Amino acid sequence: MDPKPTSMWSSIVKKDPPSKPPVNDGAPAAILGMVGNCKSTKGISIAVVDANAIIEGRQSLTNFADKFVTVPEVLSEIRDPASRRRLAFIPFTIDTMEPSPESLSKVIKFARATGDLQSLSDVDLKLIALSYTLEAQVYGTKNLRDVPPPIQTVRVKRLPEKDLPGWGSNVANLEEWEALENETEEKSNANSKILPLKDLNMNIIASDNVSEVGSVVSHTENHEEDVQEGGKKHRRYPPKKTEIKLEGKMVVEGVDASQGQYDDDDDASDWRPAVSRSTHSKYLRRKARWEHYNALAEQEIQKDQEADKARHTKEANETHAKDSGKNGEDISSILKDMRLEEESLRALQEETEETNAEATLINGEDDIDHDIEVEAEGIDVANQALENLEIASEAEDTFEASSIGDDGSSEQSWSLRALSESSVACITGDYAMQNVILQMGLRLLAPGGMQIRQLHRWILKCHACYTVTPEIGRIFCPKCGNGGTLRKVAVTIGANGAIIAACKPRITLRGTQYSIPMPKGGREAITKNLILREDQLPQKLLHPRTKKKASKPGDEYFVSDDVFLNHHSDRKAPLQPPVRKAMSVFSQKRNPNDNHYSRSMH
């Protein structure tokens, strides 16, 4: 037999190509193999670590997770010899990985919405995007937010103020203080030498008591008030009279009139106090007026007492008449019932015999009792059904209220959703990264417990004209046009839902005022002259043309990232204004005339 012919290249071409393994978009094979087993005894299977977590955590990171991943740029950020030595001797390995482009774009969009984009570096954005990628591969993106929750505005007339420390309910041992207060109110120690507060009367005594030297006596008439008709009738009372007893003499409003008022001796009736005639006449007029008021008050009290007695007697007579009428009605109803019973018994005796009558009566009573029991059971069942219906309706109301209240837009719900039980976490101490991670719904671990307590939304506020803009990437104020006056402030949602805009201290102008260099002309002048207003920038720089997509109305027309990260592949870069130099001048106390690269004159 002839040997088999050798395989020609045409036969190889005709064969079907070998099947390629399925590739998941946005997820490399390393990610799929790493997140294959999500079960972990430590609670976290994969942890995305930052440079500050590696430096601060050191060997304690071993107890946090089973595997550690990061981006390659994080390892290059650790430059000092001590940190490099610690990184070389850590008891675990840190794998490097790149996030997917889709997750990176979502993180950038989310950070721009929260106002943290300018505070995050490229490495920080990649770390958050890597956490987003791993979380999406394990649990999906349903539990993650694409847009931060909207800020709810609630108009509050007056914010509730907390009690000072140690006052009111703001004490550490409130229960002990309440128990002590209740104990002192219930029983008082008679043997104690310390008087309670209710017995401290500041030396003010009643008219029936006599105090020592220097005491003040206040004479007031105590009358009984009518409880039922209180406030309906206005009573006239004599004015209060204040007397001071000084060494046996009674002084009335600064006048020593004790002898003329309280001297009961007949021999001394001709004596008068050593005062002027006008003072004595004033005293007599006051005394007459006081006696007149007392007489009127006594007459009104007598009239009121007589009226009260008449009313009480009238009410007693009415109640007695009602009771007698009720007793008569009860007696008549009893007699009527007895007559009806006698007539029914007579009719039964005439129709049937005594035995049959007794049997029918017994059966009738049993049926009546049975019917009554059935009706009672039916009433109980109906009442129980109504109670169950009310309880169900209350439960539905509470469920609806709770579901409406927790709609995911409050600060409390942000914190609860952020503390998820995911097996993928990000370990970082950067506050801007923590703000974005918590609002997205990712799990966060802070090295050393350095974690933010409140979630913030950042805006820019001009300290020259107090204009607020949500465009966090702006350099110049959109209203007054000043550069460097936009300051980053936080818009916090408090516990009651009110928006609270943070305030920063005023800027110290010392060291910021200096002469500006003269503008220069020529082709390269655009790269040398300072930029102090937004209209100094060329139109093509403010509104760059893009061939990929048309600009939308909601897009930002000026972003500093586009200015700083605008790289060209041409041999000679076009001339552009020094926006970076303007930023350095606006953000720091730097003199633009100072040239750090000049040769020393010494």
Curated annotation (Swiss-Prot):
<comment type="function">
    <text>Essential protein required during embryogenesis and pollen development. Endonuclease cleaving pre-rRNA at the 3' end of the mature 18S rRNA (D-site); cleaves 20S pre-rRNA in the cytoplasm. Required for processing of 20S pre-rRNA precursor and biogenesis of 40S ribosomal subunits.</text>
</comment>
<feature type="binding site">
    <location>
        <position position="465"/>
    </location>
    <ligand>
        <name>Zn(2+)</name>
    </ligand>
</feature>
<comment type="similarity">
    <text>Belongs to the NOB1 family.</text>
</comment>
<dbReference type="GO" id="GO:0005737">
    <property type="term" value="C:cytoplasm"/>
</dbReference>
<keyword id="KW-0690">Ribosome biogenesis</keyword>
<feature type="binding site">
    <location>
        <position position="480"/>
    </location>
    <ligand>
        <name>Zn(2+)</name>
    </ligand>
</feature>
<protein>
    <recommendedName>
        <fullName>RNA-binding NOB1-like protein</fullName>
        <ecNumber>3.1.-.-</ecNumber>
    </recommendedName>
</protein>
<feature type="region of interest" description="Disordered">
    <location>
        <begin position="1"/>
        <end position="25"/>
    </location>
</feature>
<dbReference type="GO" id="GO:0009553">
    <property type="term" value="P:embryo sac development"/>
</dbReference>
<dbReference type="Pfam" id="PF08772">
    <property type="entry name" value="Zn_ribbon_NOB1"/>
</dbReference>
<feature type="compositionally biased region" description="Basic and acidic residues">
    <location>
        <begin position="301"/>
        <end position="329"/>
    </location>
</feature>
<dbReference type="GO" id="GO:0004521">
    <property type="term" value="F:RNA endonuclease activity"/>
</dbReference>
<feature type="binding site">
    <location>
        <position position="477"/>
    </location>
    <ligand>
        <name>Zn(2+)</name>
    </ligand>
</feature>
<dbReference type="GO" id="GO:0005654">
    <property type="term" value="C:nucleoplasm"/>
</dbReference>
<dbReference type="InterPro" id="IPR036283">
    <property type="entry name" value="NOB1_Zf-like_sf"/>
</dbReference>
<feature type="region of interest" description="Disordered">
    <location>
        <begin position="301"/>
        <end position="331"/>
    </location>
</feature>
<keyword id="KW-0963">Cytoplasm</keyword>
<dbReference type="Pfam" id="PF17146">
    <property type="entry name" value="PIN_6"/>
</dbReference>
<feature type="binding site">
    <location>
        <position position="462"/>
    </location>
    <ligand>
        <name>Zn(2+)</name>
    </ligand>
</feature>
<keyword id="KW-0175">Coiled coil</keyword>
<dbReference type="GO" id="GO:0008270">
    <property type="term" value="F:zinc ion binding"/>
</dbReference>
<keyword id="KW-0698">rRNA processing</keyword>
<feature type="region of interest" description="Disordered">
    <location>
        <begin position="258"/>
        <end position="278"/>
    </location>
</feature>
<dbReference type="InterPro" id="IPR039907">
    <property type="entry name" value="NOB1"/>
</dbReference>
<keyword id="KW-0540">Nuclease</keyword>
<keyword id="KW-0863">Zinc-finger</keyword>
<feature type="coiled-coil region">
    <location>
        <begin position="331"/>
        <end position="365"/>
    </location>
</feature>
<keyword id="KW-0479">Metal-binding</keyword>
<dbReference type="GO" id="GO:0006364">
    <property type="term" value="P:rRNA processing"/>
</dbReference>
<keyword id="KW-0378">Hydrolase</keyword>
<dbReference type="InterPro" id="IPR017117">
    <property type="entry name" value="Nob1_euk"/>
</dbReference>
<keyword id="KW-0862">Zinc</keyword>
<keyword id="KW-0539">Nucleus</keyword>
<feature type="zinc finger region" description="NOB1">
    <location>
        <begin position="452"/>
        <end position="522"/>
    </location>
</feature>
<dbReference type="GO" id="GO:0009555">
    <property type="term" value="P:pollen development"/>
</dbReference>
<feature type="domain" description="PINc">
    <location>
        <begin position="48"/>
        <end position="134"/>
    </location>
</feature>
<dbReference type="GO" id="GO:0042274">
    <property type="term" value="P:ribosomal small subunit biogenesis"/>
</dbReference>
<keyword id="KW-0255">Endonuclease</keyword>
<dbReference type="InterPro" id="IPR014881">
    <property type="entry name" value="NOB1_Zn-bd"/>
</dbReference>
<dbReference type="InterPro" id="IPR033411">
    <property type="entry name" value="Ribonuclease_PIN"/>
</dbReference>
<comment type="subunit">
    <text>Component of the small ribosomal subunit, ribosomal RNA processing complex (SSU RRP complex).</text>
</comment>
